[in-house]
Each structure stands twice: as C-alpha cells, then as structure tokens.
C-alpha cells in the first residue's frame, strides 16, 4: 500500500454505455500537483468527481490516509476542497454573503476580517455587496477562489480553475497553487492552459 495520502487503484468509470477509463492508478503526496489532461469527453471531470468522492467509480477505490473515501466521506470532506466548472454562487447573494454561507457549510466560524482580506486578495474590494447576478463571469470565479484562502485544507481538486479569468486572475491562481504546494499542500486539476507552476508538477493524460 502506498504511503501517499491520496491513492487511487484500479479506477474504472463508465458514462452511459461508454467506457471512459479503466485500470487507472494514481497517488498524490504533499507538495505535488497532478494535472489531468485529455481531449473533450475523455473523462477528466468524471475522474475529478470520483477523486472528490462526489461520484462512485464502476470499479476500484480511492483512499485518503489509507481509508476508502466512500466509507469515510465526512472526514475526507473536512480535508478537501472541490471547485467544479461552475462557481457555485447563489445569484441573489453578494460575494461576502456567499462566502459566509460557504464557510458555515464547512462547519467553520465565519471570520469577517479573513473574508474581507480574501476578497481584497482576489481583486474584489468594492464588489463585496454586489449580488452575484450582477458580477462578471471572471468576478464570480474570483469569488469562488476565495474559498481556497478561507478553508486551509491539504487537498485541492480544481476543475478548470482558470475559467473566465483574465491575465491577472490566471497569475493569481498560479500564485495560490505555488504557495499551497510550497507549504505541503496537494492539488489535482484540469486546465486547457499551460500550467507554468513552480513545484513538483506532474500530468496524467486520459486520451
């Protein structure tokens, strides 16, 4: 058995009647980033959802610290953050309110100063109280990125985190990833952008 905190063995995923991948093995250790690559429809998002415990594989298992995540979901979810394609914001709530809800759903106390600092860090100072429906796609994505700053967990699973971001936003994501890895964090991600992140970065191609 691998000593890596995250270990997947013999994963098989089927969508409809189509086999996306089978016999897939991977590990992820502190300070490592794994970029999942492949053509559209290759199963990148499906793999990330399996690794995040949001979908079950047809075969195989995912273990976190030696325990099957499907049988220990609650403890796994306290150590992992998943960011999907959509920012996951409530349209009628402001960035500030959305982040308060996000922190509360994670079972943590909302620290107003930390939320304010996170919004400033991602360039949303002055937009704290604007309903999400009035934000641009890039501003919504920046709001979602605040969750990485507010929830200090070891594992990030990010599906296309650069979506809708401008050059500064992309640079910010890279900066966050580099800091996370340098401090012993781990990351799994998909992206159509060149990664260009300093650290122990690897790739897995599903095509």
UniProtKB/Swiss-Prot annotation:
Any one GO molecular function term: ATP binding
Binding positions (ATP): 38-45
Catalysis: reaction(s): heme b(in) + ATP + H2O = heme b(out) + ADP + phosphate + H(+)
EC number: 7.6.2.5
Domain of life: Bacteria
Keyword Transport set for record: yes
Entry keyword set: ATP-binding, Cell inner membrane, Cell membrane, Cytochrome c-type biogenesis, Membrane, Nucleotide-binding, Translocase, Transport
Cellular compartments per GO CC: plasma membrane
InterPro entries noted in UniProt: AAA+_ATPase (IPR003593), ABC_transporter-like_ATP-bd (IPR003439), ABC_transptr_haem_export_CcmA (IPR005895), P-loop_NTPase (IPR027417)
Membrane topology: Peripheral membrane protein
Localization of this protein: Cell inner membrane
Domain ABC transporter: 6-207
Biological process annotations from GO: cytochrome complex assembly
Annotated PANTHER family: ABC TRANSPORTER I FAMILY MEMBER 1
Function: Part of the ABC transporter complex CcmAB involved in the biogenesis of c-type cytochromes; once thought to export heme, this seems not to be the case, but its exact role is uncertain. Responsible for energy coupling to the transport system.
Assembly with partners or alone: The complex is composed of two ATP-binding proteins (CcmA) and two transmembrane proteins (CcmB).
Family: Belongs to the ABC transporter superfamily. CcmA exporter (TC 3.A.1.107) family.
Name by which UniProt lists this protein: Cytochrome c biogenesis ATP-binding export protein CcmA
